Amino acid sequence: MMGNVVNLSEARHKTEVKAADLMDLAEYGKVRKQKRAELVPLKKARRVPIGPHATFYFESYETMWLQIHEMLFIEKGGPDQIPDELAAYNPLIPKGRDLSATLMFEIDDEKLRKSVLGRLGGVEETIFLKFGDHEIQARAETDVDRTTADGKASSVQFIHFDFTDDQAAAFKDFDGDVMLGIRHENYPHMTLLSADTKATLGADLV
């Protein structure tokens, strides 16, 4: 791993974290607080709550760069851990024609969490993004089944919204309401993206 301090603002449109992009962990430890603080405004614009329990966290090169470093720093698996972390998190970086998000159902009460998730099987297939005449159905990551055989949803879902060239151009130019929604019969909720969030996500479509 490299020992240089990385300027994340210069990495805005990178689509993959490479081993050469990683800091020496001793050096990362020195700037860890600074790097986490740098991403607070970015993460705020990428956080979209929907309904009482769900939150979308739209990912980017910067958020995944930080997440990979955090995993390496906390777990201390050494060089052998690096390929696994890159393989796990690189698919969540938008590639220029998609928006990528981690959807989390955040419920502290264990009994309530089990009850809610037990009724949300297949929720990953009911997510959409709508703007103007365009509606984009979310595509779930297929690394593992996010719904169990007995119909229980995972509390963490990884999803993508895939855009055509025309849809990407339309989204970047669109100045009306952008709706993010879930159509699951047991969690029918929708929300409008803030102007800040819409602009941030539009910049992901290059």
Language-model segments: residues:
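Long, contiguous binding/interaction regions
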Residues: 3-98, 106-206
